[in-house]
Amino acid sequence: RDTDRSRGLGDVYKRQVILSGGIGSRMGSNIPKQYIMVAGRPIISYCIDKFVQSNEIDALVIALDKQWIDFIQPHVAMLQLPVYYAEPGETRQHTIYNALKLIRSHGGVDDDVVIIHDSVRPLVSSQVIHDCICGCIANDAAIATISVKDTIYMSTEGNCITDVPKRSTLHAGQTPEAFKLGKYLKIHEERSYEEIAAVTGGAEFAFRCGMKVFLSKGEELSLIHI
């Protein structure tokens, strides 16, 4: 263990992973959007603050290209918890895998909760964070979601409706996502590089590999990303 402190929910050790490897091409900037300055601070720092202020995490892992470490360090230097840096992978899921291995190498045990959040979603609330962690502790994993309000149409042939799913069964996924370290790391270790590269969603991957994924309550604002 990195620390003897117990914060938040009982004795479960909780480690947050901030994914910060994206390029942010939609904004037409040479600077990745998570590092754009807003009121004198990079966007990623607002995400970090939300989790620190929730008093739910014991350690922070930032997955980012090493060229940005010197830029980020002044914004995390005063945090009263351990901070580690993981290397980004070829895909989002490879980046997550790198972070999981780093956590294990620093004393992570199977029942630790790993909370994953995108660095460009700074509007997440403490309640959403809390509910996601609680859902993970009671199950194998959790993802913040909101109920779908619009009717969703399916088309397996491209042009005409082939099915209309029942709206009450549909949920839109957000971040954070939370996973029990042991089970989530294991399903990565048992898959090939190519299989991990094909993953399009962390919670979907957990579900398809047999983990029980709880749908925790999200918020409309949490859907907004910069």
Each PLM stretch: what is its role?
Residues 1-13, 225:
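Single conserved hydrophobic/aromatic residue that forms the stacking wall/gate
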Residues 14-69, 83:
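N-terminal glycine-rich phosphate-binding loop and ensuing alpha1 helix
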Residues 18, 44, 99, 118, ...:
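Residue-level signal for inorganic ion chemistry
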Residues 69-75:
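Acidic helix N-cap motif at the loop->helix transition within catalytic regions
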Residues 77-112:
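Short phosphate-binding loop-to-helix
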Residues 113-117:
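Short aromatic-hydrophobic micro-motifs that form the base-stacking/packing surface
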Residues 123-216:
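Conserved core of the sugar-phosphate nucleotidyltransferase
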Residues 218-224:
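Active-site donor/metal-binding and catalytic loop motifs
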